[in-house]
Amino acid sequence: WKDEGVMLDLKSDQVAWADGNAWAPCIEEKMVDGKYKYFFYFSGNPVAGGGKQIGVAVADSPIGPFKDLGHPIITESPVGHGQQIDVDVFTDPVSGKSYLYWGNGYMAGAELNEDMLSIKENTLTVLTPKGGSLKDYAFREAAYVFYRNGLYYFMWSVDDTGSPNYHVAYGTSKSPLGPIKVAKKPVVLIQDPAKEIYGPAHNAVLQIPGTDEWYIVYHRINKNFIDREKGPGVHREVCIDRMEFNPDGTIRKVVPFYSSVFSVSRLFPLPSASIVQT
């Protein structure tokens, strides 16, 4: 890994409308007007006060420099409550269209305009899966969308980010804007106290290009920080595990491990005599 430095500082004048806290961001590569651009979406604390709002900054390189649009692109909840956080962007491989998803206490989605800097207001859709409980699929936050074999998979996190019970559930749709059909066995990833694995959620998904090999990336609470009152504070660690599908397209429950799921050379084959420093 190489530290490329700060890509965007919300405490500086780089983002005039916000005062700190680039919360739960995501980045998307998209060709615009014949040139690849990198779009960094984030939730910031508005200078004027109130709840978080979603902004976007743009660069010609994934390491920046990024330039903020100058104003937020999502300012209010479409349902009158919840927070405008946990943004995700999905580009549909079928249509080439890009979609923005966000929300805490609700899930919203909308098609992005071709410039990737605003949404098509008439496409804004509330997608919140109905029902469920904290034991299974009651929606809290962290929507994530991917496509496989004609289905759009919607994943989300259940319970609170600081809870050992924080976990991942999912559903599917025939459209990137729903409606979502919750899976019969919706829980994909959940705590395993016997292995001292707690709060595994707020995930993303990776597909090895050209294969049907998939991985789920998420964070979980370090076992020594599970008691926030007695412990030194929240400490989360980034993890990755293999994610597999049944023949009918349903996702098999992920079994989290402490050991590595693959090596660097497994993903990116190295020429002979190459050395990887870790």
Question: Where are the regions a protein language model picked out?
Answer:
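Carbohydrate-active catalytic/glycan-binding domains of CAZyme proteins
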Residues: W1-T278
